[in-house]
Amino acid sequence: MCWLLVGAVDEGAGIMTLWQAVTWDTARAGGFTAYVLLALSVIVGLALTTQLQSPSKWPRIINNEMHNFLTLLATIFVGVHILATWVDPFTKFGWNEIFIPFVSHYHPLWMASGIIALYLSIAIGISTLLRSKIGYKMWRHLHILTLVVYALVTLHGLFTGSDTQTWWGLAIYLVSVALVGGLLIRRIRLANAQKSRPQPVAVVPQPQRQYQHR
């Protein structure tokens, strides 16, 4: 009888260990995949605003459809990341720690950066759905917050993600920041060049005088 009890306990412990491994790896993979997709979405968005395009012999992959598709995929993997983090028995995060900033028992500041980024992303998504009602100009101003979301998520991943300790994880962050930073600088330079460019002066045609022959 004792052997049966010991065997049942060992089997239960093995199942819990397996479950913990699955949820932990899913949370890690979901979060990192969401970050990569978000970075690609931001890169495509900045490329569109700076009039960059793939070589003429390649398919036209830099377009609004690709930007929206990457954003949708990133949103899905954010949901996977949040759900797996909540059910993971190792991290032991409650719903309040997942959705309320600065109350987490683990790196509260950097966890808060991810939570704030989540709420900003929701606001940007709602503004996109209401673009016809709020106007294009207002939507453009709100859409710029995507860069803030990207910065907050980068900090969240760097300081809370375990994959930051790997060379490939750190390399992905560095390449991502370099690409986004370079495109952002190009975007600012183009905007400044357009502002400094002299605007054409409208020429008002003068009425022609009619001469009378005497």
Write out the residue ranges for each language-model feature.
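Membrane-embedded alpha-helical bundles that constitute the cytochrome b-like, heme-associated redox core
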Residues: 2-214
